[in-house]
UniProtKB/Swiss-Prot annotation:
The lineage of its organism: Bacteria, Pseudomonadati, Pseudomonadota, Betaproteobacteria, Burkholderiales. Its EC number is 2.7.1.23. This is NAD kinase. It is found in: Cytoplasm. InterPro entries: ATP-NAD_kinase_N (IPR017438), ATP-NAD_kinase_PpnK-typ_C (IPR017437), NAD/diacylglycerol_kinase_sf (IPR016064), NADK (IPR002504). The keyword Cytoplasm applies. SUPFAM superfamilies: NAD kinase/diacylglycerol kinase-like (SSF111331). NAD(+) binds at residues 85-86, 159-160, 187, 189, 200-205, 224, 258.
Amino acid sequence: MTSRFRHVALIGKYQASGARAQADARDGVMEDIGAFLESQGCEVFVEKSAAEEADADASVGGRYQPLTVEEIGQRCDLGLVVGGDGTMLGIGRQLACYGIPLIGINRGRLGFITDIPLDNYQATLIPMLAGEYEEDHRSLMHAQVMRDGASVFDALAMNDVVVNRGATSGMVELRVSVGRHFVANQRADGLIIASPTGSTAYALSAGGPLLHPAVPGWVLVPIAPHTLSNRPVLLPDADEIVIELVAGRDASANFDMQSLASLAIGDRVVVRRSDFRVRFLHPRGWSYFDTLRKKLHWNEGGS
């Protein structure tokens, strides 16, 4: 069976470092997947950072042409991401503007968005490469940190934007506005603005609801609020959300927990819906509810 995707970028462990990343680069998985893709008629490239990690034994870095993220966006029609959800978050944000679909092979832990098991990837990928797949689009958030009327930090987020206190400081006080409307001043350890994708991450641990990916909304979740009546709020993603730091020391804004901006009193974190979306491809028959049931261990012990 010949692949409908002619130019495939192999992307792996995009932000990993240290002993685990070095072991991953040398265990032959990336090389095996690359050889499999070639057997399906694909021209294989490797993302530059993955190539540099693999250069220790030249298993991947020396066999396939390395490309920057920009070059992948311009030359490839599929990205195959090998890693965990963090790997997918990082590359998904960067490739969203190019509209390239992504397939995730899970070698992390939970794997909500890298959903193909490593031990069964060949049987799963063969029909997908031939065009038998489910397509799933995920929204992105565009966030800016505004200081004295100027943007001092700018980032995309697929999971969440989190404004929180410093590790050794007390609560922060945050002024929250949605659209043109003032919501409240909240005293808490922090506040999470989560997308549907991020509703299964930090927001879920903080007591937020699950939000189906097809819902055009965000969820606003307080972290350990001083007032117990402060509850998660579901919002339309067409509205701009503004979080202003009123009081607190060593506060910061985190974007997918992969980039961070320190905040000063009076700084405003402005979150809007991005114009870009991430395209995921899943095996035929994939269901969001199957993922929830498996990853959250629903029905365990039941009939």
